[in-house]
UniProtKB/Swiss-Prot annotation:
Binding partners and assembly: Interacts with RAB3B, RAB3C, RAB3D, RAB8A, RAB27A and RAB27B. Interacts with RAB3A; this interaction recruits RPH3A to synaptic vesicules. Interacts (via C2B domain) with SNAP25. Interacts with deubiquitinating enzyme CAND1; this interaction results in the deubiquitination of RPH3A. Interacts with GRIN2A and DLG4; this ternary complex regulates NMDA receptor composition at postsynaptic membranes. Interacts with SNCA.
Source organism per UniProt: Rattus norvegicus (Rat)
Keyword Kinase attributed: no
GO MF term list: calcium ion binding; calcium-dependent phospholipid binding; inositol 1,4,5 trisphosphate binding; phosphate ion binding; phosphatidylinositol-4,5-bisphosphate binding; phospholipid binding; protein-containing complex binding; selenium binding
Protein name: Rabphilin-3A
Cell compartment(s), UniProt: Cytoplasmic vesicle, Secretory vesicle, Synaptic vesicle membrane; Cell projection, Dendritic spine; Postsynaptic cell membrane; Membrane
Domain notes: Binds calcium via the C2 domains. The calcium-bound C2 domains mediate interactions with phospholipid bilayers.
Main location: membrane
Role: Plays an essential role in docking and fusion steps of regulated exocytosis. At the presynaptic level, RPH3A is recruited by RAB3A to the synaptic vesicle membrane in a GTP-dependent manner where it modulates synaptic vesicle trafficking and calcium-triggered neurotransmitter release. In the post-synaptic compartment, forms a ternary complex with GRIN2A and DLG4 and regulates NMDA receptor stability. Also plays a role in the exocytosis of arginine vasopressin hormone.
Binding site for Ca(2+) 1: M412, D413, D474, D476, E482
Length: 684
């Protein structure tokens, strides 16, 4: 009996097979009973359902290829813009910002790639196994990023991809009644193999290096009662066509990883994006609605378009034949797909399907949030885009920054989402005194804030030398907040009283850390690499908004202390408890001194208090008004923050303010004044 069992599984001999041996092979272990031979499969014609599946796969691949080409074009355009904006020669001046280098200027480093000299602010120190530090300028760093994120590092250039032509459908499918369920339909490969839905990495790794997908798509999986032992990549792509828009949303959760680019020859880039764009829906998904009568061109599908990802404002209603679909509009830059700087986005050759496809239906409103939270094709490195606007109100010395929204932010939490907020700083001299932030929005990668943050006391001089840094961070309740990305804008490029809108990509810049207390005597909480800014030989301590008016009706001077901004931090917590002290000199006794209320733990206090001095107009010209700002401390002397003096002996804006007050009676005149670390008396 044992011999019988063993002989049952023995291979046939090398000699000629007898007729009965061939019959046993057809019914034994070599061929599954009821299976069709390859010859029988090739003689059969594909059904219309199978042709539709194939055509939809081709159409989706065309669309994803177009999206990939547009994405690469945007990366190259960004790189070219950085190259055009160079301001130095790379020898004596920084190649990027044009700052003087050498002993009298900033410290310089040499870029490892281009061998140009850059300052330490425009250079980035990269991690390397070398014993000495390796520096790269931001242009070369961006070029490496483009080379990495486009896949050109593997292909030594951008591959030109030509997809197969769609198959013509000879006959149309009869339309089923509305009440009749969609039964007896051709089962999809996904339903035939519910337990064989490989991950994205498995789909790419199963194909040997250099192997291309087979051109014969007629051998769709599952034509017999059982499929082949392993699924080819072409079959895996075709098995993903039956999912609807809901399957797209739920199939792209936070667990989606990086887009791997396996060495698959010229088709590797397309295969990775096709697999990512068409992940299979779960086997428990409900069957789609009954199909409509088929036209000469296959339907455009019912699923929603991919999420906006890195660049927002992409249309979801344009048909696949539209050359701008799915085009992402970035107002800050012009889209280009031509050859630039050695990189070229390969032109796309559309098949007949693109011209015969009907218009795509807009996705349902309830799916927009899930679509927006889905990944794009370079999800491993994208940081997202930020939309905001800037307005400088010159009359009120007010800079308004309206944070509108962000799209496609990098997921920071374990659920694939983030808790983003935006914070602003003015450079140089970033500190808590000029930090503004929005509220935090929970569990979203596409937050909409619509918040306006205002900087008061921004003069024309500040607009010429300040830079606005806008950072997007993820709030963490149980740890440190995480940095997502940032962008910077030089305020001298902003025209007064003209709102300017921006929609730009966030940059991968490490945020500056606070370096403890650089001035322990003053408790200044400054950021690393940000030195204390000085105007001439006078250290910047903040600004104060003062109003002056001589009232003829009351017969005296009315001094208004409105607010202070960007005060120096005097306490260990990085804040101050400021109040303002007024003194009309020469001494007029106790009635010459006034104090405001104390504002706790703030560097931008708002007082809105007025004080009256009973003095004749003729005597006012001989007086001077001493204004000082103090930090209130309990149990010890108050700390002096800064001050200014208005009067005939003053200079510049201070003298002008005092003169206008004397000249224009009964008229309130407001002016911003810089606080200085001048000689002062102790506060009482």
């Amino acid at each position: 009996m044992t011999d019988t069992v063993v002989n049952r599984w023995m291979y046939p001999g090398d000699g000629p097979l007898q007729s009965n041996d061939k019959e046993q092979l057809q019914a034994g272990w070599s061929v599954h009973p009821g299976a069709q031979t390859d010859r029988q499969r090739k003689q059969e014609e594909l059904t219309d359902e199978e042709k539709e599946i194939i055509n939809r796969v081709i159409a989706r691949a065309e669309k994803m290829e177009t999206m990939e080409q547009e994405r690469i074009g945007r990366l190259v355009d960004r790189l070219e813009t950085m190259r055009k904006n160079v301001a130095g020669d790379g020898v004596n001046r920084c190649i990027l910002c044009g700052e003087q280098l050498g002993m009298l200027g900033s410290a310089c480093v040499v870029c490892e790639d281009c061998k140009k000299n850059v300052c330490t602010k425009c250079g980035v120190e990269t991690s390397n196994n070398r014993p000495h530090p390796v520096w790269l300028c931001k242009i070369c760093l961006e070029q490496r990023e483009v080379w990495k994120r486009s896949g050109a590092w593997f292909f030594k250039g951008f591959p030109k991809q030509v997809l197969p032509q769609p198959m013509p459908i000879k006959k149309t499918k009869p339309q089923q009644p509305a009440g009749e369920p969609a039964t007896q339909e051709q089962p999809t490969p996904e339903s035939r193999h519910p337990a064989r839905a490989p991950a994205r990495g498995d789909m790419e790794d199963r194909r040997a290096p250099g192997q291309k997908p087979g051109p014969d798509l007629t051998s769709a999986p599952g034509r017999g009662s059982h499929g082949p032992p392993t699924r080819r990549a072409s079959e895996a792509r075709m098995s993903t066509t039956t999912r609807d828009s809901e399957g797209w949303d739920h199939g792209h959760g936070g667990g989606a990883g990086d887009t791997s680019r396996s060495p698959g020859g010229e088709q590797g880039l397309r295969r990775a994006n096709s697999v990512q764009a068409s992940r299979p829906a779960p086997a428990s998904m409900p069957s789609p609605a009954p199909p409509q009568p088929v036209q000469p061109g296959p339907p455009g599908g019912s699923r929603a378009a991919p999420g906006p990802g890195r660049f927002p404002e992409q249309s979801t209603e344009a048909p696949p034949s539209d050359p701008g679909y799915p085009g992402a509009v970035a107002p800050a830059r012009e889209e280009r797909t031509g050859p630039t700087g050695g990189f070229q986005a390969a032109p796309h050759t559309a098949g007949p399907y693109s011209q015969a496809a009907p218009a795509r239906q807009p996705p349902p409103a309830e799916e927009e949030e899930e679509e927006a939270n889905s990944y794009d094709s370079d999800q491993a490195t994208t940081l997202g885009a930020l939309e905001f606007s800037l307005l400088y109100d010159q009359d009120n010395s007010n800079l308004q920054c309206t944070i509108i929204r962000a799209k496609g932010l990098k997921p920071m939490d374990s659920n694939g989402l983030a808790d983003p907020y935006v914070k602003l700083h003015l450079l140089p001299g970033a500190s808590k005194s000029n930090k503004l932030r929005t509220k935090t929005l929970r569990n979203t990668r596409n937050p909409v804030w619509n918040e306006t943050l205002q900087y008061h006391g921004i003069t024309e001089e500040d607009m010429q030398r300040k830079t606005l840094r806008i950072s997007v961070c993820d709030e963490d309740k149980f740890g440190h907040n995480e940095f997502i990305g940032e962008t910077r804008f030089s305020l001298k490029k902003l025209k007064a009283n003209q709102r300017k809108n921006f929609n730009i990509c966030l940059e991968r810049v490490i945020p500056m850390k606070r370096a403890g207390t650089t001035g322990s005597a003053r408790g200044m909480a400054l950021y690393e690499e940000e030195q204390v800014e000085r105007i001439g030989d006078i250290e910047e301590r903040g600004k104060i908004l003062v109003s002056l008016m001589y009232s003829t009706q009351q017969g005296g001077l009315i001094v208004g202390i409105i607010r202070c901004v960007h005060l120096a931090a005097m306490d260990a917590n990085g804040y101050s408890d400021p109040f303002v002290k007024l003194w009309l000199k020469p001494d007029m006794g106790k009635k010459a001194k006034h104090k405001t209320q104390i504002k706790k733990k703030t560097l931008n206090p708002e007082f809105n208090e007025e004080f009256f001095y009973d003095i004749k107009h003729s005597d006012l010209a001989k007086k001077s008004l001493d204004i000082s700002v103090w930090d209130y401390d309990i149990g010890k002397s108050n700390d002096y923050i800064g001050g200014c003096q208005l009067g005939i002996s003053a200079k510049g804006e201070r003298l002008k303010h005092w003169y206008e007050c004397l000249k224009n009676k009964d008229k309130k005149i407001e002016r911003w004044h810089q606080l200085q670390n001048e000689n002062h008396v102790s506060s009482d």
